[in-house]
Amino acid sequence: MKNTIEHPKVFISYAWGSEDYRLKVRSLATDLMGDGIDVLLDQWSLKEGNDTYAFMEQSVTDSTITNVLILLDPIYEKKANGRHGGVGTETQIISPEIYNKVKQEKFLPVIFERGENGEIPKPQYLKTMLHF
C-alpha cells in the first residue's frame, strides 16, 4: 500500500560527518517524527551485519517512501560529485530518477550546512533544483 501525503514517510540521505553532525541529523529525524512523519534513518534502522549499500538502494527505491530528504553540506557535495562512499552510491541511484523525471517531487534537496563562505553546497546533479 502506497503512503499518501496525509501519512508521509521520508528517507534521510546525508553524508556521515562528525558525531555532532550525526546528532543534528538525528535531531531533525526526531522532530519530523514528532510532526507525524515516518522517518527511515540509517542510524536507527541499520544493525550490525546489515549491508549498508543494500539498505541505501532499498531506501531510495522503496515505493512507500514519499520523499527522500537530501541533506546538503560541503562533505555531501564533495562525495556526490566524486561518487565516493555511500553518498556516491545514492547519487548513482538518485540522479537518473531526477534526470528522467523533470517534474519529480520525491527527491528534495535541503541546505543543512553551508560552506565556509556561505555558499550553497549543491552537487552537480542537483544544481538546477530548487531547495529548502
Q: Could you describe each region identified by the protein language model?
A:
Residues 1-74, 100-103:
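Conserved N-terminal substructure of TIR/SEFIR domains
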Residues 56-57, 96-98, 117-122:
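Catalytic micro-motifs at enzyme active sites that drive phosphoryl/nucleotidyl and oxygen chemistry
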Residues 20, 77-80, 116-121:
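Short catalytic/ligand-binding loop motif for oxyanion handling, primarily in non-cytosolic enzymes
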Residues 45, 74-76, 110-117:
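Short beta-alpha junction loops
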Residues 119-132:
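Short, electropositive alpha-helical surface patch
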Residues 51, 74-100:
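Conserved TIR/SEFIR loop-to-helix hotspot centered on a Trp-containing motif
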Residues 69, 106-110, 130-132:
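Hydrophobic/aromatic beta-strand patches that form the interior of the parallel beta-sheet core
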Residues 27-28, 55, 59, 86-93, ...:
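Alpha-helical scaffold elements adjacent to nucleotide-binding pockets in ATP/GTP-utilizing enzyme cores
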